[in-house]
């Protein structure tokens, strides 16, 4: 029964993707084939190798001018850039799109794409980017209050005029993008708000908020719980089941008492708000849209971290309340990449990483996130400040990923995967076809000078199986061995060639043998080197009579 239900849901999702594609006047949309999502523009798949600008860098055209060529030199193909409500609408109903136009012009000049980040009602929980005419009129645009009755510069999600003002401004932005960019398609996605989340309480506690909280859970959410009982994510399902799996009732009767229920309530209303903004914008120009989340830190309670944002433990709530959003995205300032990526790829959610702490390990994580999670894209934060080793490493990783992206996007593979290894997790195994691969950090060999260091740089690799016995290995700092699943066969390296890929064509550079593959024992890319190697295998009998 569960398998049948999953088939029905997958069929529904596939049909939904087709409907989105057919109804999308922008010609830019997300499709999913099997477990691999793709961003398409004019039916051409596109992988975002991006970087997000620092918060203030897009507020001046003069400041921006040298940034775009710098980022182009780092092999980026996409820039994630804020659009500031306070600058775009300095007076009510009077819009200034000069910064937007300037960014589009710069991106086109360097053949780059843009993802705009709408710094609207909320940015990192706060309402700091709202126009001054809103900030100074708290009666018309109400704020949240804390447990002491003190107001904060966080607009209430229940402010109807706040929502209408945001929708009007966002719609104006999307209309302007359609009028100026629908042909050239420089802008390919839009983020709605930025890191929505409630501070310093788990939910709003105003009279208006309390009246909603004391009312019944909306039928839309109750219907979703009942129809999807068997496949609800465990975090939400547990709260509902423990409270008796009721089919209606107040928030506390359905989900129990406590901060967790407060967060579910607030998430519902945040998601509804974001959905209205996104839906209004899509009516003008139907680009893919997403929201991003500030991830909670261990041991913190809702309200101590930004509560009720698009977090994985309340993903069900966000997805049912905000169908106009194409995905929910994590912002990474947390080292546990695998843990959070696993959570964000549940429920059919396509992974896109709009922010990651800018550090040298980003270069390895790019291979892992694109290869293992089939991410739509990857984007370290404050990218214009990359320099030294960080710049060099990320530039080389992006160059390699860009060269193999044609193979990935055109689906010219049997399978592919990505791995991330460091000193803590020095070796991993995966199966590809008839072979078991052991992927280790290059320092595990003990040959390199850095192998004795207490900290090893992260290494990353993408492995693409092109045919039964042919593989591409693209990355940095790894050692790979191959073993046949059939114990009666011994697998050996037939040839290992360093190649480059240009205009989709594989170009031979160097035959790697002898010391470079340890006399045929393994494939190796040294730490500090970035390569694409083409590997051909052959099998021989394990025993010879």
Place the predicted regions along the sequence by residue.
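Bacterial Sec-dependent N-terminal signal peptides
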Residues: 1-23
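N-terminal carbohydrate-binding accessory modules
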Residues: 21-77
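The substrate-binding groove and active-site-proximal loops of carbohydrate-active enzymes
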Residues: 48-59, 82-100, 148-168, 254-271, ...
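Aromatic-lined substrate-binding rim segments of carbohydrate-active enzymes
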Residues: 63-138, 270-284
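Polysaccharide-binding and catalytic clefts of secreted carbohydrate-active enzymes
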Residues: 140-315
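Catalytic-core region of carbohydrate-active enzymes that cleave or remodel glycosidic bonds
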Residues: 276-287, 313-411
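Aromatic- and carboxylate-lined catalytic core of secreted/periplasmic carbohydrate-active enzymes
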Residues: 367-487
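C-terminal beta-sandwich/jelly-roll accessory domains of carbohydrate-active enzymes
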Residues: 448-456, 470-545
